[in-house]
């Protein structure tokens, strides 16, 4: 059976200061089709916890403690939304949160691999995010990097990144005006 990692960014999951529910429904519909009709194992790496938290509490997202607070508020809101949407297709979801140290620890990475295999064997869709509440710096960049790690560690056949960026840039186009595709 083929294994696919899909990473979705905050910009796709939010619209203004709200969750983009129609986009999320479209994503859930796509994943459900891939899982049920195409018989693929799907792992979802989802950003959006901070954005979802911001829909409830307006804090300055440039302050680390505020960002962590927003993630603490937003992660359960995001998971509840996913759970309700996937439930319409009869699909169970599970949450897995990681920090960079988890990939440096043989014991933790082995435990995560064991859990992942059990989830996928039982047709559960794992939804993965960085554990922003305890992370003091983003995992070597962001959830795009996390998705690459997940693809490698869990031996996925393909990684698909859903984003609002036009393509692969040689540097971050939000920080460098001379970034090239």
Cite the ranges covered by each PLM segment.
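Nucleotide/pyrophosphate-binding catalytic subdomain
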Residues: 1-181
């Amino acid at each position: 059976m083929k294994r696919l990692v899909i990473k979705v960014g905050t910009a796709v999951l939010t619209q203004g200061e709200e969750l983009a529910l129609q986009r999320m429904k479209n994503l859930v519909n796509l994943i459900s089709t891939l899982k049920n009709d195409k018989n693929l194992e799907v792992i979802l790496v989802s950003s959006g916890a901070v954005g979802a938290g911001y829909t409830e509490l307006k804090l300055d997202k440039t302050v680390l403690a505020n960002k962590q607070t927003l993630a603490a508020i937003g992660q359960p809101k995001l998971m509840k939304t996913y759970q309700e949407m996937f439930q319409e297709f009869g699909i169970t979801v599970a949450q897995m949160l990681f920090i960079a140290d988890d990939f440096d620890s043989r014991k933790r990475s082995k435990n995560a691999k064991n859990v992942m295999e059990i989830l996928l064997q039982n047709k559960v869709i794992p939804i993965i995010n960085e554990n922003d509440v305890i992370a003091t710096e983003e995992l070597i960049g962001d959830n795009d990097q996390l998705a690459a790690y997940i693809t490698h560690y869990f031996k996925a056949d393909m990684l698909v990144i859903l984003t609002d960026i036009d393509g692969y840039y040689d540097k971050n186009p939000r920080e460098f005006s001379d970034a090239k595709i």
